[in-house]
């Protein structure tokens, strides 16, 4: 039997631990935990690290104005390291151990698909800030990036137009995973509907982290000998750097073979001599070069944040589309929490419908009433010598997302509201 003195000691210790526990949980309740889940290492770090940085800046901005529901937001940053199964583990950790009220994260669709069952099982909320292939509408995700009809389809329509070079043949080049393959399936069906034959469509995929583009670029040149050709690039991550370097090495100019990219923005061009790429294209819903007061403040705030926090290459930081979508998403979530009066996922989900926010893209963006996607303007930009983009085409107003593409058979029977996807 335990001696009486030991018992008293043990009881005193457990009482201290319990009271410490209460103090900790009370302290934790003074803040609202917010998960930030982006790859800060591995092949996707080039693209995802700035999303973590802009998320922290946005949280600081909200906290400086008093936080949400009178509480400060407390960021919890995790690094899933471009490792797709690790994303699911980190998501579970954020929701169960860290008790995050919401998570802002992911870039690749394979990372989003990895975490989706976790968010649906635990009824967590994920804000996903990157353009993607559609074919998904989860009640546990808000998609603040573009669906194919808000990026891919308009970009290819532009390439086929006189202004875009009247392309007749299409070289679809992507990283080998769900986003490029599904997007290209949609684009192939779209091109068929416009009378483009399979012989005039080439599809090539490379692994994540791929760097030897010599043969592929040489094949693009051969394919282009058969008629006016455009390249549609869904290459993701740091592979973009060697791809664009190889285009320059082989003397491919935008006037000969235009390349439109869906995952290359200002950040990916930071490490490249952009002079040989002048005139090449990217389709997004925001560019840093957009001239309006809201964007001027967003860009200035981020530059100041980078300097104050000694971010790597702070003197040359840029903003881009997924950063803007992250910024908009965090602000919309904060507004929805204020409206709901709670961080409860079901109540916040309901409060998100119809939320609006004046975005740096120059438009007041609306979260759709039913489909969990943002209405977004579509823009096509040309690379300039300084690594920025000049907008050469854009819609005159935001476009409603079509997560279920009409170019995929059977989609017309799918509901226009979220349904759990994970089994």
Each language-model region and where it sits:
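Segments of small-molecule ligand-sensing domains
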Residues: 307-323, 332-402, 406-407, 419-423
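Extracellular/periplasmic periplasmic-binding protein-like sensory domains
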Residues: 247-327, 338-341, 395-422
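Extracytoplasmic "Venus flytrap"
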Residues: 35-54, 78-85, 107-110, 176-181, ...
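Beta-alpha junction/loop-to-helix N-cap segments that form part of ligand/metal-binding clefts
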Residues: 46-53, 66-136, 144, 205-214, ...
């Amino acid at each position: 039997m335990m001696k009486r003195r030991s018992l008293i000691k043990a009881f005193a210790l457990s009482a201290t631990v319990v009271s410490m526990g209460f103090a900790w949980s009370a302290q934790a309740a003074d803040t609202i935990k917010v998960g930030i889940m982006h790859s800060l290492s591995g092949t996707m770090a080039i693209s995802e690290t700035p999303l973590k940085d802009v998320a922290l800046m946005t949280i600081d901005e909200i906290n400086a104005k008093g936080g949400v529901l009178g509480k400060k937001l407390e960021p919890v940053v995790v690094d899933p390291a471009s490792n797709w199964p690790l994303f699911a583990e980190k998501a579970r950790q954020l929701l169960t151990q860290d008790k995050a009220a919401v998570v802002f994260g992911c870039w690749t669709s394979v990372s989003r698909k990895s975490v989706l069952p976790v968010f649906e099982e635990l009824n967590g909320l994920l804000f996903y800030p990157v353009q993607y292939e559609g074919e998904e509408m989860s009640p546990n995700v808000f998609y603040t990036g573009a669906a194919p009809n808000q990026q891919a389809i308009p970009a290819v329509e532009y390439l086929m137009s006189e202004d875009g070079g009247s392309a007749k043949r299409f070289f679809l080049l992507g990283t080998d995973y769900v986003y490029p393959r599904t997007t290209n399936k949609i684009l192939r069906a779209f091109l068929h509907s416009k009378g483009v034959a399979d012989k005039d469509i080439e599809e090539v995929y490379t692994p994540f982290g791929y760097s030897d583009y010599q043969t592929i670029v040489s094949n693009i040149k051969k394919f282009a000998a058969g008629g006016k050709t455009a390249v549609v690039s869904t290459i993701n991550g740091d592979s973009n750097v060697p791809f664009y370097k190889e285009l320059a090495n082989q003397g491919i100019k935008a006037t000969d073979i235009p390349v439109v990219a869906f995952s290359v923005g200002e950040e990916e061009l930071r490490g490249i001599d952009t002079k040989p790429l002048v005139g090449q294209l990217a389709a997004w819903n925001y560019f840093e070069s957009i001239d309006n007061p809201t964007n001027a403040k967003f860009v200035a705030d981020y530059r100041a944040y980078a300097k104050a926090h000694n971010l790597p290459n702070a003197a040359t930081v840029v903003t881009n589309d997924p950063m803007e979508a992250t910024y908009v998403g965090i602000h919309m979530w904060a507004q929805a929490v204020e409206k709901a009066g709670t961080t409860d996922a079901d109540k916040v989900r309901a409060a998100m419908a119809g939320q609006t926010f004046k975005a740096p893209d120059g438009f007041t963006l609306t979260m759709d009433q039913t489909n969990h996607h943002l209405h977004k303007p579509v823009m096509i930009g040309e690379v300039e010598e300084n690594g920025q983009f000049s907008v050469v085409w854009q819609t005159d107003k935001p476009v409603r997302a079509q997560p279920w593409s009409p170019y995929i058979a059977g989609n017309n029977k799918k509901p226009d509201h979220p349904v759990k996807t994970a089994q």
